[in-house]
Amino acid sequence: MQIVETTNEGLKRAYTVTIPAADIAARVEGEIKKIAPQVRMPGFRPGKVPANLVRKMHGPALHQEALQTTIREAMDKLVADNKLRPAMQPAVSLGEGYDEGKDAELTVELEVLPQIEAPSLDGLKLEKLVVPVTEAEVDEAVARIGQGQKSFTDAKKGAKAKDGDQIIIDFLGKVDGVAFEGGAAEDTPLELGAGRFIPGFEEQLVGVKVGDEKTITVTFPEDYPAENLKGKEATFDITVKAVKNAGEFEANDEFAKMLGLESLEQLKTLLRGQLEQETAGLTRTQMKRALLDQLAAGHDFAVPPSMVEAEFEQIWAQLQQEAQREENPEEALKEIEAEKDDYRKIAERRVRLGLLLSEIGQANGVQVTSQEMEMLIRQAAQQYREQDRQRFVDYVRSEPLAAAQLRAPLYEDKVVDFLFDKAEVTEREVTREELQAAIEAEEGAAAEAKPAKKAPAKKKAAKEEAPAEEAAAEEKPKKAAPKKKAAAADEAPAAEEAPAAKKKAPAKKKAEG
């Protein structure tokens, strides 16, 4: 086999590889000898079919298989002999006019990973913004649960409904005098002042009594999900069947026992733990972004364009999906299109950070254990139907690239934790609002990719936390979804989705989307 380098520019490499016809033919002959004992043909005893007949029957298929195997081996040799670290799968093309009996002339094009030295971790300093959980916040959390457990009892006869009361109603909605689908319901509980129905609905029912029949007029919002009701004026015929007063909520041991706990103190302890876990997640997000900003500021090496393009395509696809869910998809698409160059630079930053974190992890022995990997696979399999889970597990175990993409986020977190341990960390107590503002500021600064302009405040900033793969030479960057600047934690979804519209009762505000 002959290998000739034809391009060596920056991170681009190209080669011509010549595989002698004799090598391919020898592999074909070897395969014929392997399968001959299993070939059956009328007129011949089992295993006694002549090689020339086996070749005639199976030759083309065996040649194609031998050619593909030889090409794979040639690629392995090319990578090993030249100590290459491909950024992505090399592009391999077989010369035109190739036929059996001829030498195979291959053209190979690829991009390699840059040579990166793991940076010194001396002098790495980080500030940890800590939000203490106050007793008032715990009490508020208890009160919120109490609101959800609110009980109602019948009001005195003839009592008029007021804000905070619950009324039981039948209603029939009409547009232009005609009832519309989903606009009628019976025995519907409605808490006045809760804001669960469309604007103007609840307000007109303050003061009603049991037995009252009333017709109210409302206007559906312009962003109402049902196209036939958007902006339309409608009337609702209301029959009041009950008026109920809310019971007084009291935070005590009895209330905690209603929730299956032993005491109010136990409830508060659980809620405090939840609040502390939530703020700890925000603190980690702030520290991680500050860390990545420091790393990005100190490194500006070239990265493979193919990796940047793959990362950008993932970001772009997610942004387009988000835009389609906006109130005005066309306007949202125009907005992201105007900022396309910014997002491409964000993709470049993410790839660069991913390679850098990978190098740091490998240089310092950071690993994802087999037990951790097994847990990852099992957790990921849960998103599939039960009958498909084992197939997914088998696929990940047999496909190195699939396993690498699954492992990458955990590996990145382990590298980040390693850097946290190495850094000189100073703590400062702040309020939740101050912590959130710090996250927003870091996210906005990260989105400013030189020499691009700073991203607008309402721009959806792509996630800056780049991948950090365990074997960068063999793995693509993690394809993490972009997210809005308003997202609080780097583990958060790309966009908070509004609840789906309820078809049952269009009058409810929840159905507004």
UniProtKB/Swiss-Prot annotation:
Biased composition (Basic residues): 452-461, 501-513
Domain of life where this protein originates: Bacteria
Listed Low complexity bias regions: 489-498
Keywords: Cell cycle, Cell division, Chaperone, Cytoplasm, Isomerase, Rotamase
A GO CC annotation given for this chain: cytoplasm
InterPro entries xref list: PPIase_dom_sf, PPIase_FKBP_dom, Trig_fac, Trigger_fac_C, Trigger_fac_C_sf, Trigger_fac_ribosome-bd_bac, Trigger_fac_ribosome-bd_sf, Trigger_fact/SurA_dom_sf
Enzyme Commission identifier(s): 5.2.1.8
Places the protein is found: Cytoplasm
Annotated catalysed reactions: [protein]-peptidylproline (omega=180) = [protein]-peptidylproline (omega=0)
The record's note on its domains: Consists of 3 domains; the N-terminus binds the ribosome, the middle domain has PPIase activity, while the C-terminus has intrinsic chaperone activity on its own.
Official protein name in the record: Trigger factor
